[in-house]
Amino acid sequence: MIDIQKIRADFPILAQEINEKPLAYLDNAATSQKPKQVIEALTHYYEFDNANVHRGVHTLAARATDAYESARGKVAKFIHAREVAEIIFTRGTTSAINLVVDSYAEANIEAGDEIVISYLEHHSNLIPWQQLAKRKGAVLKYIELEEDGTISVEQAKKTIGEKTKIVALAHVSNVLGTITPMKEIAAIAHQFGAVILVDGAQAVPHMEVDVVDLDADFYAFSGHKMMAPTGIGALYGKRELLDAMEPTEFGGEMIDFVELYDSTWKELPWKFEAGTPIIGGAIALGAAIDYLAEVGLANIHAHEQALASYAIEEMSKIEGITIYGPKDASKRCGLVTFNLEGAHPHDIATILDEDGIAIRAGHHCAQPLMKWLGVSSTARASFYIYNTKEEIDALIDGLKLTKEYFGL
């Protein structure tokens, strides 16, 4: 069980009021709030250990390096990687996916090869593959969705085949919250000799992820969605794949030896981390992982699903509300995307903000999915470890007020 009030006390931002109303932050799929433990880890680094890593023998450099590499170890343990060297620090999910595209895919995709994604994908896991396919003359194929917006193993089997070289899918949809059967789809991909990349931006913060059990070849995620600062994320890759890949950025830190006309690279993971890394961000990510591990991801997932189930139940009672995705909360993570007939999503979000309720409105960086849903935009409420049933009640009251405001 989660002690919500104890957890909420760890998040300074939640104590404030917006428009003289208590802040109800329901925009966690966009970014998460930060507990004081993470903020303190970041400030401690800058107050006491600020130095560059791997490049000095003085005490500050040694402490900074130890903290930075310790964070890498925490990431590896958190997602159950085989070894620490398989964890590459990146700026976030987007840069992690682009690293795979620009290095692995650029070297291995040829004209006529097929890349399989889905209509669920965030633009960050669509545009890089789209542009690669255009450059290479490859074929981009989409797994059809079921009526409730889920990806089924059956549809994956129909799409993945002999010409498939890469499968790239979101573990959890940032719009519908649907959970992809990634382990089964990875097995299908591997039957045809394809590699699978998983966009885990919406999964790692909210549920247990075991990259070895999934048999993912690559797994990308961001820190800011799991209570760490912006600008830090990670890419997991199987060692044999990463070893064979060439760096895509060059400069200090990633080199082994430099001559006038040639250079050699460091071993994993550092050959992919050119320049001064995001040291403070990585250390803070480690602190966020400590926090999540202490609460327990199983507890977090159950809490969020309970909130989603309650939100769906209460929203369904409001005439004119359309909820997208499966109504069964066990098939999704803790977010609900919806529309109110007669009210634009941006108007809904604006009215809710007057009551201190923060949600997201727009296409959520998923325009192909919006087209599949038959809409241009939606409203989205997304939950996390610190959200409460009372905040869902406030959301429901705000939606009823929106109906009154527009005379619906």
Please tell me what each predicted stretch does.
Residues 1-408:
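Pyridoxal 5′-phosphate
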